[in-house]
Amino acid sequence: MTESTFPQYPRLVLSKGREKSLLRRHPWVFSGAVSRLEGKANLGETIDIVDHQGKWLARGAWSPASQIRARVWTFDKAESIDIAFFTRRLRQAQQWRDWLAKKDGLDSYRLIAGESDGLPGVTIDRFGYFLVLQLLSAGAEYQRAALISALQTCYPDCAIYDRSDVAVRKKEGMALTQGPVTGELPPALLPIEEHGMKLLVDIQGGHKTGYYLDQRDSRLATRRYVENQRVLNCFSYTGGFAVSALMGGCRQVVSVDTSQDALDIARQNVELNQLDLSKAEFVRDDVFKLLRAYREHGEKFDVIIMDPPKFVENKSQLMGACRGYKDINMLAIQLLNPGGILLTFSCSGLMTSDLFQKIIADAAIDAGRDVQFIEQFRQAADHPVIATYPEGLYLKGFACRVM
C-alpha cells in the first residue's frame, strides 16, 4: 500500500521521553505517557502513536477511559488494521497450535492469547468444533466485525460463540455481551479430551470460556504425586485435577468448591471416565472455612491441590492478596502429613513467581513446617508469553514437599 492510498489515522502524541517502552515493543501506552491526541478518535478506533517530535512508533487502538490509553496492534507502519491483518495473525497463531495439538493429541486449546499473539484484548479458545471468543478491550470490540470475518475465513466449519461477559469490559466503557455469533449453539456440556481424560465443558455458563485450558500440564503433572495418596482438591471447579488424580491412582480425592453446579459436573466427569466414584468426595463449602474446620478436627492429607481464583485485580489489592495467599497456603501446609505434597498456584498477573515463592516460604514458617520446592509450573504452551510482554506470564505454581 502506497503513502497516497494508506488510511490516515488520528495521532496519539507521547510526552518527551515516554517512548522507551514502545521502542522495546511493549504493547501498552499508559495515560501518563500521553501528551495529546491529534484528530478525533472514537472508543477503540485505530490511531497512530508518535513520539513528541512526530516520529512514528506504532499503530494501536484508542481507549480514552482506560489507564491503558492505547494497545498496540502493530509496529509495522506498512500494516493496515483490517480483515487481512486479523487473518494473518490467526494463521500465525494456528501454526503453533497445530504442532501442539498433533504432539499432545489435543482437540481443545487456546488459539489466541491476547498480546502474546499480537491481538491485544482478544482471547479465543477452541473446543473442538466451537470457537469461544472474548473481547476484553475497546480496540478488540471496535474490530469485532473484522475479527469475526477473519475467523470465518480461517475456520469456515466452526461455530463461533461470544463470551465477552467479563467485568473488565466495564473499565473501558463497554457492555457485557454473550451469545452465538455464527453456527449452532454449544450443547449444555461439550465433551473434550485432555491427556487421556474426557471432560465436560460448559461453554455457555462456565467460568471464563468454560474451562481452564492453561492448567492442562499441571493437571497431568499431578498424577506422579498421588498414587495411593489421600488428595484434597481445593477450588476444584469441574474436577479436572480430581479426574487426573484418580487416573494417577489416588486412594481418595476430596473436591471442594462453592458452586454446586461445578461439583455436579465434576461428578459427571469422574463417571464419564469410568473411574471409581467411591474414591471421590464432593464438598460444597468455602475453602478457607473448611480448611480451618479440618484443622480443628485433625484431618490429614497426603497431597493438597490449591488452585484459587485470582485474588488481585490491581496493585492496590496486592498486599491484601499476599495475605490471602499466605493464609490459605499456611492452612494447607498444616493439614499435610510429613512428606506430603502441596501443589499450589496463583493466576494473578501482578503476583510474580518470586513473590509467590516467598509467600509460600512465609506460610511454611507460620505453619511451623519446613518446605522443599521440588517443581515449578506455568501456563500451558498454547498460552505463550511474548518476550516484550512479561505480563503475559500470569499463571505460576509450585510443587512443595512439606516436612
UniProtKB/Swiss-Prot annotation:
Its EC number is 2.1.1.191. Residues 9-88 form the PUA domain. Its main location: cytoplasm. PROSITE patterns: PUA. SMART domains: PUA. InterPro entries: PUA, PUA-like_sf, PUA_sf, RLMI, RlmI-like_PUA, SAM-dep_methyl-trfase, SAM-dependent_MTases_sf. The keyword Transport does not apply. It is an enzyme of class 2 (transferase). GO terms for molecular function: RNA binding; rRNA (cytosine) methyltransferase activity. It holds the Pfam family Methyltrans_SAM. It comes from the Bacteria. It is found in: Cytoplasm. It catalyses: cytidine(1962) in 23S rRNA + S-adenosyl-L-methionine = 5-methylcytidine(1962) in 23S rRNA + S-adenosyl-L-homocysteine + H(+). One of its GO terms (cellular component) is cytoplasm. Keywords: Cytoplasm, Methyltransferase, RNA-binding, rRNA processing, S-adenosyl-L-methionine, Transferase. NCBIfam families: PRK15128.1. Specifically methylates the cytosine at position 1962 (m5C1962) of 23S rRNA. This is Ribosomal RNA large subunit methyltransferase I.
